[in-house]
């Protein structure tokens, strides 16, 4: 059986991107092939996360809609045949690309009226998922599944850049 292809819509902030590595480690343990879309500020970090197969620049500034760009970007993703998208940010705009790309399963937490855009909507229970890493990992598992112990985020070092 081939690996399941998953698209992750990454967080915009560097700290959240580092924490998202726990999700990528969990997905990789379950034989998922992981592609990630990220803004320019955090995309370089993805080259240091070994579980990520491919990172793609999503060139939309924080708060910008740029619907035409999102639609074109989504169309370019269709040929990748993703089976699932995991949307880490809680904004309506962050869920647009997976919807427009016709990805069959679109997972994320409820927020900002995303009912049409997501079809695997999770309710956030802050007592069950108190930490951001818990929330990210929960989106990579079936709803209400018990969480495994998270791996510590670890980034690879580029030996060429060391002096």
Where are these regions (language model features)?
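Catalytic machinery of carbohydrate-active enzymes
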Residues: 1-163
